[in-house]
Amino acid sequence: MPVFLMALAALGWERPGLAQEPIQSQEAPQVETRDQHSVPAAAAESERTRDLPLWELGLGLGAVAFRDYRGSDTTHAYPVPVPYFIYRGQYLQADRSGLKTKLFNQDRVEFNFSLNATTPVRDNAARQGMPELRSTVEIGPALQIHVWRSESQRVKLDVRLPVRAAFAVGSPGYIGWFSNPNINVDIADPAGLRGWHLGMLTGPLFAASRYDAYYYSVAPQYATPDRPAYQATGGYAGSQVLAAVSKRYPKFWTGAYVRYDDLDGASFENSPLVKSHSYWSAGIGFAWIISRSDRLVKVPDTQSPSVTESQ
């Protein structure tokens, strides 16, 4: 997902690059749905709102550590900028989980934009003598379905269905599509930790043959006794489990994530470039709020009263 780098990674965006699919942020307004038979107290709870700025802008710094590519056994750590931008429009919202709008005016369905970016790979031992992997950018639509909400709106279950087109910077240009449908759980005030948000997601990954070939194929001219020729075919690309925590203070935001990748059963698992079938990656970031709109909008309150008042 993007030029947002650490800000998105800390909220669950994953790799083949710096970041990817988002965990739902608490900052964007949500449309409330209430059971007509719910008790008055529960209705009052779900109707509670607070006034927040129409937009907020911030900047910070973070660090991420991840493999050169999925399946690599080489890990690098990078400092990354942490842009912070929130927009709470009626029909269009932007937050750390991306740009989104309501689809067909349905409360339970949203149309989002899914983004991702990767760093170049130049000195990987498994790819010695092969062309470097260029930085890539991925962009495409994502359908987000709100499956379930608790009465207090503090626990949310979503299903996300993204598909992105991937482009290598420079040659070869378009390298195919990538998709990672996932189940996403977002919890406000987990374990009584007021103001914190915990996000967890898991799901399979799929890619086009052209996409997998970019990372895992070995052309005959680059074959060696220890690295035989190999042609990636595309299809199932493994699975991921991710957890992220974040908290918004009056003047700054902080977040961190940890992710586990499993490549067992992936269509390319027998590629000589795959050196690790499972591994962990992580990141942390901070951002300071430097400007905000004077105009206020009402946002459903999913935080405990004391936290709401402190902000």
Describe these PLM feature segments.
Residues 44-55, 70-71, 90-109, 148-157, ...:
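Short loop/turn motifs that connect adjacent beta-strands in outer-membrane beta-barrel proteins
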Residues 61-65, 81-87, 98-103, 139-147, ...:
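Residues on the lipid-exposed face of transmembrane beta-strands in outer-membrane beta-barrel proteins
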Residues 64-70, 118-124, 146-150, 164-170, ...:
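Sequence/structural signature of outer-membrane beta-barrel proteins
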Residues 172-253, 261-267, 273:
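Outer-membrane beta-barrel transmembrane domain signature
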Residues 46, 67-69, 99, 126-129, ...:
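Extracellular loop and loop/strand-boundary signature of outer-membrane beta-barrel proteins
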Residues 55, 75-81, 107, 133-139, ...:
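Residues that define the transmembrane beta-barrel architecture of outer-membrane proteins
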Residues 241-311:
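Predominantly the C-terminal beta-signal and adjacent terminal strand-loop region
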